[in-house]
Structure formats: C-alpha cells, structure tokens
Amino acid sequence: MLFEFARWLQQFESLFGLFNYLTFRSILAALTALFLSLWIGPVLIQKLSQFKGGQPIRQDGPKMHFSKAGTPTMGGSLILMTVTLSVLLWGDLRNRYVWLVLVVMLAFGAIGWYDDWIKLARRDPNGLKSRWKYLLQSIFGLAAGLFLYFTADVPAAVTFYIPMFKSIALPLTSISFVAITYFWIVGFSNAVNLTDGLDGLAIMPTVLVACALGVFAYASGNTLFSSYLKIPTIPGAGDLIIICAAIAGAGLGFLWFNAYPAMVFMGDIGALALGAVLGTIAVIVRQELVLVVMGGVFVIETLSVIIQVTSFKLTGKRVFRMAPIHHHFELKGWPEPRVIVRFWIISVVLVLVGLATLKVR
C-alpha cells in the first residue's frame, strides 16, 4: 500500500524513487514487522494468557516441561499478523508470488489455529487428528503446486536444479512438479512444527533460513545476478525478499517473548504457517535441495521421529530416549538453553553452507 503510494509520489519528488529498490523496502519490511511485534506482543500475550489455561503439556514428555503448564500458546498469530501487515505495506501487490505466499501462510496458519483451538478447548495436547491435519495441508499444498505450474512463464520455473552441479537441469512434468511442491510445503510445515518443542528453538532457525532464502529470491529475480551466479532466473521472484525480511523481523520480535523462559509459545498456528512459507519460497526460487541443507535442523528433527517410530514398530526398541531429538538431549541431562543454543549454532553453519552454493559450481 505504502509502496504504491510512494510510486505515485515519485512524480512529485524523486526521493521517493528509493522505494523502487527491493533492498530498501526489505529493510523497512523487517523493521516494520519487528516494531509491530514488540508493540502488539504484550497486549496479545495478556489476552492469550486469559484463554483456557494455556498450553496443555504432554504427560509422557520430559518432567521439566511440567513447569511450562499454563504458558499461553497461539503466539504465532503475532508473527502472521505482523508479517501480513508489513508485506501489505511494503510489498508489490501486483506480484502473484507475493499473494501466493501470503495465502499459503494464512491457510496453513488457519489449520494450525484450529489445531491449537482443539488442544485448548479439550485440554488435549494432541489436538486435531493427524489424518484431518494432513488432509487439509495436502489440499493447500497441491493447490499451490498446481498454481505455480500453470502460471509458470519461463521454463526455469518448472525445472529441478541440483546445487553445485548447475549445468544439470531436469525439466519437470506437471505431476512431478506438483508432487515436489507438495512434499516441500507440507514436509517443511510439519518439520518446523516438530522442532517447536523448546523455547525459541524453532524461530531462530526459521529467521536464519528466511534471510538466506531472501538472498536467493533477490538473486533469482535479478537477471544480472542470476546469470553471474548461474542460478535460475525467475521473473518476479525478487519481491519475495520482502516477505523473507518481514518474517525475519517478526521472528526476532517474537523471540523477544519466546526466549527461555518463554512468556508465550508459538503454537501450530505459527509453526505450520512458517514451515509452509519456507517450502513455498524454496520451490518458487528453485532451491529445494538448498532448503534441505539450510533447514537441516528441521530435517534432523523430522528424521529422528521417523527413525524412532520405525525402529519401535520393527524391533520394539527405541533409538532415542525420546523424539524429536531435542527431547533426547534434554533427557541426557542437557539444560534446555544449551540444547537451544547448540541447535541455533548448527543452523547458522548449515545456512552458511547453503549460501556457499551460490558460488560453488
């Protein structure tokens, strides 16, 4: 909105030409989301704390988590609100990718909200039944894949690329493209949700990955940079840096309240939405495999659950003391802050490795 207004004002004052620069608007988007989060956060947390007694705690979870009972949840709604407002203010609302990512974020956020609502209303930490959750996620994930495939305006937008082997380009059929899009959106949506089990554990890796995806989006949308770096040129993808910046700002603002000991939990409303956004942006800029690397913390958490369940079903034995794996380290005696910070460090390293693929040929 403000971007369009600034474009109109440019005819009277050349200074408003600054708003044509994605880098300038991305900074404004990040700051807007950050300050909105810090401003709205205390009020929202106060309202959430009055609702249904706070987050139900799993009885089979680590005993140290029982002290968290009553902590308000659904704090992810703060992230969704501030990201949406910031993008509407500073994003190019003529860009179809901007609208797609916003719709995906709000759709998965709605699924998460319903899941959180059931947990609170029924005092059941399991929430919405898995089959219904996956069904709803699948509908939106498949819809996003179909939209991206049938609106693609360049061959690169529907081609699969392998990092570090930039001469390898695999054209995708409609079925394979939609399938990949589905698995990345739904997969990362649930992966971030599984990671969100400790104070601040999921949000910092999300911020880091969002920042890195913003770099990829900016480069992919710029013909000069994409040609030099030998990455696919996707017209219009550059505007996704606004969303990535808004997520970074909103995420840091949320972390102010979610840092150990948390004043509020993100809840499924935030985790499902943010994971879906990361998956969607990675698909748009054709960096699916890079996301697997940069989002390695999310991948490891998910694999730990898969390994644990598979091992128990086949052998009756558990590989980890508890899954996801962050609980395993808790039960080994690691203090919660140590687990969190070490996972953050791993995330920083993996994001740097992902960014390095921009230059590795």
Swiss-Prot record:
Give the UniProt keywords, A-Z. Cell cycle, Cell division, Cell inner membrane, Cell membrane, Cell shape, Cell wall biogenesis/degradation, Magnesium, Membrane, Metal-binding, Peptidoglycan synthesis, Transferase, Transmembrane, Transmembrane helix
Q: Which Pfam families match?
A: Glycos_transf_4 (PF00953)
What does the function comment of this entry state? Catalyzes the initial step of the lipid cycle reactions in the biosynthesis of the cell wall peptidoglycan: transfers peptidoglycan precursor phospho-MurNAc-pentapeptide from UDP-MurNAc-pentapeptide onto the lipid carrier undecaprenyl phosphate, yielding undecaprenyl-pyrophosphoryl-MurNAc-pentapeptide, known as lipid I.
What is the gene name? Answer: mraY
Entry's EC annotation: 2.7.8.13
A GO molecular function for this record? phospho-N-acetylmuramoyl-pentapeptide-transferase activity
InterPro entries, alphabetically? Glycosyl_transferase_4 (IPR000715), PNAcMuramoyl-5peptid_Trfase (IPR003524), PNAcMuramoyl-5peptid_Trfase_CS (IPR018480)
What PROSITE patterns does this protein map onto? MRAY_1 (PS01347), MRAY_2 (PS01348)
Classification from the root reads:
Bacteria, Pseudomonadati, Pseudomonadota, Gammaproteobacteria, Lysobacterales
The protein here is known as Phospho-N-acetylmuramoyl-pentapeptide-transferase
Main location (coarse class)? membrane
